[in-house]
């Protein structure tokens, strides 16, 4: 049994070692990128575990976050990760070092977790600005506007800085349910130098702004009725 345990631990260690960014030959820019991506993915998990431990995690938020992860994963992350329909898989749009640091088969999970954290921060931001418990009782344009501005701001930042070489330029992204125009209709706005913002990559969060707000409203009202 002890030999089996040692073998199991060795296997786990080797798996972790393969994923560890420092073993992948990343340059300094890529390393910072990888650390930001993993930090963004781990943040909602760590915060959720902490709030659950403190018994302060609201059920409607838990359900909203789980739904957000699934919507992001099946709405666009899986599609553009594997280049399902008329697109390049992610490994063709980035360096070998990045493909090593964030393997393709977990890349969509990491990004979907990051998307979940973005939505959660949006909910927190709304609560901080309006400071009342009725923000998610029904649709309010003021609340939607805050969410929309936040979602679009972060996504433009991601497209221009973190994932510029993966989703910008001449990269070919797959069609996805929440990126319906694909490359067939994809006007681009040149912002700084060669950095562009494209309709295809922004459409996920344009549509998502409505979807995630309505999901939040649904679970908030449903849980509130049961109390």
What is the meaning of each model-derived region?
Residues 5:
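Cationic, low-complexity basic patches in intrinsically disordered or flexible, solvent-exposed regions
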